[in-house]
Each structure stands twice: as structure tokens, then as C-alpha cells.
Amino acid sequence: MSILSDTVRGVGRLFFPVRCPVCGGEMPPGSRVVCTRCRYAVPLTGFCYATYNPLWERLSALVPVEQASAFLYFIPGSGWRELIHRFKYDGAWRLARDMGVWYGHCLADSGLYDTVERIVPVPLHWRKRLRRGYNQAEYLAEGIARALRAEVDRHSVRRIRNNPAQALHRHAERWDNVEGIFAVRRPERLAGHHLLLVDDVLTTGATLLSCAETILRAAPDCRLSVAVLAVPQREFGLDG
């Protein structure tokens, strides 16, 4: 049966080759997420291996976070930007989960996230979720949870206001746009635990910080860490 399955897959690849979501090249058999060339060229930040990194410095100045990490740099016009766009807007949610697994193994290897018990994806408002069909942050969280062997908590935090997209606002207006948009409905599930707040892309950080502040107000004795998939290279890169 496995020989037949392998044959069918081989014929399928011959006529319908799997393409790398970053460069568009053909994916070699056995490749995961991206092709081998792109895997070695990923613009990693290295933040998951160091507590004192640029993202932690920015966030910890505003909220008490234990750890803060970003997996890669968001570079406009790059194939990695297109990968994120695909799982965020084009329905390729499996990409988000696979990227989460990859990211999660880096977090696990660092040893800095070993005590994380619950992973909280930044929620979407139900109207936006209904329109999109899913929340990409949940699939990222699922992938990370596999590597960290932690529980994904999708229900304790909810988005109560459907604020306009942050991209529609100037930098200063984004902070007003996120005020009071989250609520915690099950604080007892968060209290006393080490939580990992997960989102896809951080720009100003206004949305993520609003969510973090809401959690810490509802469960002040929890420990909070943050993991986002990508941050802008121009703001967080060593040469940016």
C-alpha cells in the first residue's frame, strides 16, 4: 500500500510539482515548508536564543514580559513577505501551522521557553474571523505548541471590538485604534501560569501590547512571554 501511495505521489509531483512558497521553485521530495535553498537563506533574527534582544527591549519597557522572540525579519518585496501574505489572506493556513512547528523547535532548543504552559493566540474579532475563515495566529500557536508540548488556549481571551486594520492608520493613531479591543473571560485559566502570547507580524506592537495589558490586568500573577513570527528588518535588524 505504501509503495502504491509513493507511486501516486511521484506521478502527482511529475505533473503537478509542489512549489516553494518563497521562491516558487520546485520542492524536492521530503522538503518541509520551503525548499532547501530557502531554508538556508531564511532571514532569521536569532531572538529566540537571547533574552536581551531588540524585541524584548521594546516590549519590556511597556509591559512586564519574561521573554520575547521573533522568528524572522519581515522584508517588503521578499518571498518571505509573500509566504506570510499567503497564510494570512489567501487561505494557506497549513503554512502557518508548519511555520509554527519550525519556529517552535527553535524556541524549544533555546531552553528559554521550557516553562511555558499555555499558548494564547492573539484573537480576531468574530466578524473578521468569519470573513477570513480562520485565525492564522491560532495555527501558528498550534505548531509552536507541538514543539513546546504546551496547551493552546483559544477561548480565555476574546476580541470585543472590530477595530479597523492597523495598516489604515498612521503610526500615532494605531495606539488609539487598539484601546479596549480585548477582554478576558476566563481569568482563572490564565492565573499563575506561564503564558506565551502568539501573533504573526509585529509592526508598532500596538495590538499585541493591548492584548498583553488586558491579560496582565485580568491575571496579574501570570508570567507572560511573547512570540511573533516576524518583525520589520528596518526597525529590528542590526543593520536596519
What are these regions (language model features)?
Residues M1-V198, T203-G240:
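Glycine-rich phosphate/pyrophosphate-handling loop used in enzymes and phosphotransfer proteins
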